Amino acid sequence: MTIILTNDDGIDAPGIKALAQAVSGKNFIVAAPRDHQSGCGHQVTTTRPINLQRRSDSEYAIAGTPADCIRIAITQISQDVKFVLSGINAGGNLGVDAYISGTVAAVREAAMHGIAGVAISHYRKAKQNFDWELAAKWTAEVLEELLHRPLEPGYFWNVNLPHLQPGETQPELVFCQPCTKPLPANYRIDGDDFYYVGEYGKRERTPGSDVDVCFTGNIAITQLRV
């Protein structure tokens, strides 16, 4: 069974290295964007060539979006892909974030082709540093649970890790529903220019939703569909 690893932060980002650490010992191929693609959503490339750089037998840097990476991985790199993992994103992809997230788009694209997948993101609190070793540990625990759970066709998992401080209680895995409340749409205006200043951590949230679960220190797991 071949697992494809991808992300939207780029192939050299620390998050995808932590993801590789989480699946150490499994048969995986990294097929990830050559450059940063955060916030690209489900964009695909159809009007220009997509350059592929083979770094090794199991690592490919692709000059495209996360969805492009999955399309190329499952049609050109391996015919035996059984699972797609996307992440670990440096920042949350909670609730309605899924619609603009390249991280989530990668596993949505996989689901469209009948391949199961998990998107993993790490909420960041107040621009504090990430502990990628800890993120890899949590991700391994999550995948131990999810890789063996059946998924109906067209469904996929979206996981968000909390941002905890040393000594805080170990997070629980909580299966929940995605929050449908919007992201803050606040802007600073300078002449004809609008600068986004919405504060992610101050977004509204429905009690018990993925935003609420993650913001209160637990691992939020939602099942989404195409």
Curated annotation (Swiss-Prot):
Principal location: cytoplasm
Enzyme class label: hydrolase
Gene Ontology CC annotation, any one: cytoplasm
Reactions catalysed: a ribonucleoside 5'-phosphate + H2O = a ribonucleoside + phosphate
Location(s) in or outside the cell: Cytoplasm
Secretion signal, residue range per the UniProt entry: none
Gene3D superfamilies: Survival protein SurE-like phosphatase/nucleotidase (3.40.1210.10)
GO molecular function annotations of the record: 5'-nucleotidase activity; metal ion binding; nucleotide binding
Taxonomy, superkingdom: Bacteria
EC numbers: 3.1.3.5
Cofactor binding notes: Binds 1 divalent metal cation per subunit.
Organism: Nostoc sp. (strain PCC 7120 / SAG 25.82 / UTEX 2576)
Binding-site residues, a divalent metal cation: D8, D9, S38, N89
Disulfide bond annotation, renumbered to this chain: none
NCBIfam families assigned to the protein according to its UniProt record, in alphabetical order: PRK00346.2-3, surE
Protein name (Swiss-Prot/TrEMBL): Putative 5'-nucleotidase alr3139
Family indicated by similarity: Belongs to the SurE nucleotidase family.
Cofactor(s) essential for the protein: a divalent metal cation
Sorted UniProt keywords: Cytoplasm, Hydrolase, Metal-binding, Nucleotide-binding
Function, as annotated: Nucleotidase that shows phosphatase activity on nucleoside 5'-monophosphates.
Pfam family, one: SurE
